[in-house]
Amino acid sequence: TQAAEVRESISLTGQFAAVDEVLTGRENLVLVARLRHLKEPGAIADDLLRRFSLAEAGTRRVATYSGGMRRRLDIAMSLIGNPQVIFLDEPTTGLDPEARIEVWQAVKELAKGGTTVLLTTQYLDEAEHLADRLAILHEGRIIVNGTLDELKQLLPPAKIEYVEKQPSLEDVFLTLVGAKTDKEQR
């Protein structure tokens, strides 16, 4: 039926990772592929583990994964069956800065690959980095939507002032742990 086809083309990843911590990452993916009655669930799992930089961790129990790894696995599970549209509900809530960047990379790759990504976030910097179109909700209603440039045009022209930029705490953290910032990865 048409309704079934629509349901097959849409996937959802909730605010909190819905992974089975007793299973390995690969077992989680194989389980979902089997539940969707797909052929070659092992090959599907291996492909997604590679795509989400989890191949080395695939045989470990999910309980040993970091927050970012769990979120990437959760997103990978949502992609089983190749949905055309994926809803991500606050995918980086509660993650450390390094894990947030890992999830941002995964989301960018999805969009680059042709998947339509609908993402909710409370982090405005995240919306700026990831979205090509934005909708701002206030008190349960969409009050404006458009591209970032269109939304910026709603404000009066900015006054230019020279302000020396000091590194943020996030910049310090990412430098100390040797991670690349989102800007450095572009």
PLM regions: where:
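Conserved ABC ATPase "signature" region
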Residues: 11, 30, 34-57
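Catalytic Walker B motif of ABC-type/P-loop ATPase nucleotide-binding domains
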Residues: 86-89
